[in-house]
């Protein structure tokens, strides 16, 4: 449906939109769902992210998708009956090398078969539908049996389905807080000078006041929202802006009316409302302290201590901490662009952390509840050695760290650098900048910041801290952990459905296997359930890997409205909380309007807690860094949960089972997610190449153009040239959801800008100097 199937359904409905009245959820032009009253169209790929051809193997049924000569499907051939069409009609160039070979083997056995177009096209389409239906029914049945949740009825993606399962079956009370829209501080609009006065009162009188500068404005039980409130003394603090409260001294003509507002904005009305509000607060028994804006400004002129205090507030009255600023992705880059083993004892090894994110979800600590907010000067009393939570601060990196610790978003990428200015300028030379130019401001998870400090980062200023209580799994007692119940449930299912390991052939070996697994994971396997079940294993793996990302989803996602009435379009344009992005005509009666809301105005979803998402990715980066730190300059490449490195006898290596790349001989990379290597296959006794390039499908045709040799030639020669791959018949949808076929070309070139290049194909972080 995301591809183009949904386009046919939608355009048919839009031809008679008054009858169908479809509502759509989309991601750009990709259709996620179409709903018409009680009928809902959803995408199986949103739940089962695999090709239809692997459904039979995954869900263990006998049908096979088979092959069809798509290019033979022309009007001239609709009544064709004869020999099987030639290979050129089967789009063999668009297949992987393995798929292509399977097709060649099959085609060679069909010499005597008769191909009747009118029957074969129906048979192929029916088999597609049959496989899809059987796979989806089995998936839904397994999901409901295991989770008591109907994925297709109660969610639109596997991620939302996982979140629903967690909240229904595993979420403990009072553990995950819903972060208020706009955060905890300065979300209530209050003038900067009002915050300064409230902070001065806190400082000079040593009282704790709740106000918008560090949390939300307090609403007293009588329903009145006040500027500040001290619980201990039952005191309300009100800052009276002269303009908004009708100050008689500053506005002696009390009949003045703001021409942009209504008659009720006359100064005397504002003054009377202020007096009445003050009387009401006192009547309710509150101590009331008021400060007029003009009085406070006069006080600042004569009170030097107050002026110094306001000056020293500094950046705490700037933008509040945004937890999304601490939500960085995985760490991906090449630290050396080419390496060939010396042919004697050196090897290139590929280490992959098995199930990194499920491991993090189970064993690592997570924030619970709502944080205590510390701002500005308050942060000086907080120890960075022990505080848990998110920290907004200015840091100065060391100048000689080969693998920097802290991330920084720059140039649309996640960078790890030692000088902010070198990063901005992409300076390929040695850094000559001052400390002020090298330092940068960021928001970090406390654990990642502590790791940075241990690697000689200096914290120059701390602007704000969200201090959380933590929940963590105890390996000794096998108790606790925010997500351990969820992870254990599906880890158990996955392990049981994998069957017995090959070395478990006797009852004693099976018993020891169960005991060892319990000792390691705290999960007691049921020997009666240990049998191969590829469908359930696939489901368990999906539930483990698709779980955590929902916590970091953006709240303000683009929305699409189907508009057939001019008044509805005008309403969208005049709504101050709507930002229209695009308008695409569908026909004479209907347009599609894509829109979103201003920053901070999105819906506060109950499935989202960005602090949890930030902790998840920070823990994953720290796990990867534990290997980078020890491997040092032997690292060639890393990507979120894997690392490729050089090893000689006696060198430190991560503890693990068999290495995927124990016999890698030669490695080359042209940038992040852009690498290739030659590996010796012991099973085939031959040298094989693996090549990965983000954004380009390396099918049979494209792999003739982009492969180990061409990538190596470009890197070794530092080529500025480009390679191009072509697809003569790319099926796409346009902005009006028409499905068309058109030629497509993609450009490939060396793109390396996350570190600076030096001799011998090595690299250094921007800002590095000995």
Mark where each language-model region is.
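Active-site metal-binding core of divalent-cation-utilizing nuclease and nuclease-like domains
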Residues: 200-236
